[in-house]
């Protein structure tokens, strides 16, 4: 009877955590709903704030711009061939066009604007869209200061500039502030989900630091790290980065934070009185904790 009670005690946290996590099909629905809200309500404000009339994102399959990847619908795990998004903001009319220079729509929000039978050349079709709208500014994802906003590769940049008519070249500018704004800004719904994500993260840490996982004098820091990573996998989530556990003891000298990544010993046995520090983060519904 005692063994059964112990088993139930250990299973309860897992059941509670599992109940908080949506199945894949429901996750996809939520991701796409959030994305549509961001396109329709957040993006126009960001484009107005940063002064960019037209934002063009260009990526090729398996070498995606990290910003463009956050704009893909849940069923798109990668870009397809060369994927080009064009967002055009007409502030006077208070409209925003969300176009794809692709043969198919990208989810529900981004509409195909390329009929390959009429115009076989993808670059020429992109230039037609620019000419038709004649924006004052054209934002591209290149940046010296923000890695996340530097997703346009040199090949696509060179081809774009080679095809762009001379009269539009002076309009090209870095979209770094727009790209960063898109990544850093969270909607009300995302913040509700984020609170749940933080709770799940804290619950995993609490369980990892409990007697269920750690036996003082026996369990090592490496074992706890791998337990945390396995726990995330078992819950159907993803680890944002590999967990690290380091031990702080009374007589130890303070060391640089770099010690946690390269200098700390592996398989350090945890003993009574140790203060445990962890660096841990998970990914859920395209949000991350750290």
Please name every model-derived segment.
Residues 87-93, 248-250, 271, 284:
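Short acidic-glycine loop/turn motifs at beta-strand connectors
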Residues 250-262:
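Short, structured beta-strand/loop micro-motifs enriched in basic residues and often containing a Trp
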Residues 1-19:
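Bacterial Sec-dependent N-terminal signal peptides
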Residues 167-173, 238-244, 263-290:
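Short, acidic (Asp/Glu-rich) active-site segment that either coordinates a divalent metal cofactor
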